[in-house]
């Protein structure tokens, strides 16, 4: 039905007859000549119909937006005065000689030109129209090219694309599972995988030493701008490779991808330990474009008569950190109050501050409600450590170390945006040496997952003293976003059982939930390591989209619903009966 895509026609085709198909982007009747902008996935082209062919002209005059049509005509160069530099095809146009309406379009339920006027609900309900917009189409085309590039790289490096099951067994991986009832095993359920983690480890045990898969994963969790109930991972696993080798290989892949797709050289990725990242930036995925850093000052404040500072300064689990904002002395009291409310979202009880109005005047040139509690030598040392200058403000976080990191880390990001401080377009890094465990309500939890190997300890040593142990784990971070994370895996039964026990999983419970894994670990398991990248997030960053919903063809809403298909929906009662499922209505409590 076509000889060319609309966006592919150029000056080299002048004088040729072409056949095009697509949708009417816009139609204009200007003084007896109809100008038609025809659109397909590759772009727009202008088609001109004049009254010399009355039958064709009359049909062209009836066209409205989103009619699906076939056009036949002659490519000609536009006059210099009519060249449109904003269009890929702006140097040429097609003189229409034939026109077929393939399918008419009703009046549209959403705006194609001013899509900002469409609600998110409208865009998802009529997604097939929303995806016709060039911006959306180009993102999906870009995504297809990215996955093709990734496959080429992994294929050429000896990785095998192997599928793993979608219907599997529920395992504790941090989020709720989507459950699928079994008809043949009444009362029993499959789970949709949160990741192929255990199956890819089993593939390593099976001898397939380089595996990859671009795979759907599922998590029933509260959604944010960068989360969806179903999402896509670039999943990778290797045998007989160290964490350094895995990082080197996947860094090579990511650098090649950015060079191919964006002509961006990311350069060599720096390494940073988890502890350094939390200390300097208050985050395990720091945005290095932001020059602001947290500075520890607790050692200066242990003796001050101000409990807000001295309390955390003398607490082993406390922290006092300072954050200098260049030019921040211009902040009004209301703006400082807004920052105080902002850190309160993250558990901070307040936000002390110090304005450096004129450094040459000593204490006289410094304004702060806490200045009366600090002697001159302490103030001078705070100014020195933070490298504060006249016109700056220093903000203070004092609380439990976790609260200070989270609240001041978030404030660092906000201030960096507010003061336009971000430097450079792309700043990647590896974050390494994560803690093996974290304590929540007195119980140990895996920081990554229960199959991550510790670094440099035996099973007995780990179980005897699990606190402060470091895992052989690594995250790739770009511009404050985690692109992917991975680790060396546990490859012997003794260590895996020890980790389960530390996590409060009894030997009996471990056998019930992970018996197949523990059994497999008995038969010559090779050392193995891997990682998984979030494909949707990578595409979001590379295209500049504000949400992963804008780089997925048919995403869900923030309430995990699909307005297009009205999913989820009620099941047929007969189906429920076959599955042995009864729907229990939530009881409504009434007062007597």
Swiss-Prot record:
L-aspartate binds at residues 173, 219, 448, 489. GO terms for molecular function: aspartate-tRNA ligase activity; ATP binding; nucleic acid binding. Its main location: cytoplasm. Residues 197-200 are annotated as: Aspartate. ATP binds at residues 219-221, 228, 482, 534-537. Its EC number is 6.1.1.12. InterPro entries: Aa-tRNA-synt_II, aa-tRNA-synth_II, aa-tRNA-synth_II/BPL/LPL, Asp-tRNA-ligase_1, Asp-tRNA-ligase_1_N, Asp/Asn-tRNA-synth_IIb, AspRS_core, GAD-like_sf. It is an enzyme of class 6 (ligase). CDD domains: AspRS_core, EcAspRS_like_N. Transmembrane segments: none annotated. GO terms for biological process: aspartyl-tRNA aminoacylation. The keyword Nucleotide-binding applies. Coiled coil: none annotated. It is found in: Cytoplasm. It catalyses: tRNA(Asp) + L-aspartate + ATP = L-aspartyl-tRNA(Asp) + AMP + diphosphate. Keywords: Aminoacyl-tRNA synthetase, ATP-binding, Cytoplasm, Ligase, Nucleotide-binding, Protein biosynthesis. It comes from the Bacteria. GO terms for cellular component: cytoplasm. PANTHER family: ASPARTATE--TRNA LIGASE, MITOCHONDRIAL, ASPARTYL/LYSYL-TRNA SYNTHETASE. NCBIfam families: aspS_bact, PRK00476.1. Catalyzes the attachment of L-aspartate to tRNA(Asp) in a two-step reaction: L-aspartate is first activated by ATP to form Asp-AMP and then transferred to the acceptor end of tRNA(Asp). Homodimer. Belongs to the class-II aminoacyl-tRNA synthetase family. Type 1 subfamily. This is Aspartate--tRNA ligase. It comes from Shewanella baltica (strain OS195). The gene is aspS.
């Amino acid at each position: 039905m076509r000889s060319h895509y609309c966006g592919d026609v150029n000056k080299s085709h002048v004088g040729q007859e072409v056949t095009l198909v697509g949708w009417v982007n816009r139609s204009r009747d200007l003084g007896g000549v109809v100008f038609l902008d025809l659109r397909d996935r590759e772009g727009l082209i202008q088609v001109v119909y004049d009254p010399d062919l009355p039958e064709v002209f009359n049909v062209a005059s009836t066209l409205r937006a989103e009619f699906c049509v076939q056009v036949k005509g002659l490519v000609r160069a536009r006059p210099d005065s009519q060249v449109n530099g904003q269009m890929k095809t702006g140097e040429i146009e097609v003189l229409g000689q034939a026109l077929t309406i393939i399918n008419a379009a009703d009046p549209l339920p959403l705006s194609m030109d001013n899509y900002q006027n469409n609600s998110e609900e409208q865009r998802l309900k009529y997604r097939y129209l929303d995806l016709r917009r060039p911006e959306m189409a180009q993102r999906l085309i870009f995504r297809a090219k990215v996955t093709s590039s990734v496959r080429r790289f992994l294929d050429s490096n000896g990785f095998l694309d192997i599928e793993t099951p979608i219907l599997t067994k529920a395992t504790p991986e941090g989020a709720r599972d989507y459950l699928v009832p079994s008809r043949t095993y009444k009362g029993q359920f499959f789970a949709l995988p949160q990741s192929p983690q255990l199956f890819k480890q089993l593939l390593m045990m099976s001898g397939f030493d380089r595996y990859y898969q671009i795979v759907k994963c599922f998590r029933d969790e509260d959604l944010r701008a960068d989360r969806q109930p179903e999402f896509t991972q670039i999943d990778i696993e290797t045998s007989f490779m160290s964490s350094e080798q895995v990082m080197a290989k996947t860094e090579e892949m990511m650098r090649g991808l950015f060079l191919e797709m964006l002509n961006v050289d990311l350069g060599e990725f720096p390494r940073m330990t988890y502890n350094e990242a939390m200390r300097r930036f208050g985050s395990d995925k720091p945005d290095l474009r932001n020059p602001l850093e947290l500075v520890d000052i607790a050692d200066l404040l242990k003796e001050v008569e101000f409990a807000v500072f001295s309390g955390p300064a003398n607490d082993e689990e406390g922290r006092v950190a300072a954050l200098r904002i260049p030019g921040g002395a211009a902040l009004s009291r209301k703006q400082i109050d807004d920052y105080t409310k902002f850190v309160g979202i993250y558990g901070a009880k307040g936000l002390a501050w110090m304005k450096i109005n004129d450094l040459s005047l000593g204490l006289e040139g410094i304004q702060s409600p806490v200045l009366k509690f600090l002697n001159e030598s302490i103030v001078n040392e705070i100014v020195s450590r933070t490298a504060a200058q006249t016109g700056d403000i220093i903000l203070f976080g004092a609380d439990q170390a976790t609260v200070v990191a989270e609240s001041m880390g978030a404030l660092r990001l906000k201030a960096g945006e507010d003061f336009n401080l971000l430097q450079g377009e792309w700043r990647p890094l590896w974050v390494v040496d994560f803690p093996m465990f974290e304590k929540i309500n007195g119980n140990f939890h895996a920081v990554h997952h229960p199959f991550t190997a510790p670094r440099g300890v035996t099973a007995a040593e780990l179980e005897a003293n699990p606190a402060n142990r470091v895992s052989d784990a690594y995250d790739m971070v770009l511009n404050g976003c985690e692109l992917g994370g991975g680790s060396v895996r546990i490859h012997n039964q003794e260590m895996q059982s020890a980790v389960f026990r530390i996590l409060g999983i009894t030997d009996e419970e471990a056998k019930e939930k992970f018996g197949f894994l523990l059994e497999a670990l008995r038969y010559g398991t090779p050392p193995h390591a891997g990682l998984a990248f979030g494909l949707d997030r990578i595409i979001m960053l590379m295209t500049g989209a504000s949400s992963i919903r804008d780089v997925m063809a048919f995403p869900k809403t923030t309430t995990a619903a699909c307005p297009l298909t009205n999913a989820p929906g009620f099941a047929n009662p007969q189906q429920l009966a076959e599955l042995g499922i009864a729907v229990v209505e939530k009881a409504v409590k009434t007062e007597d």
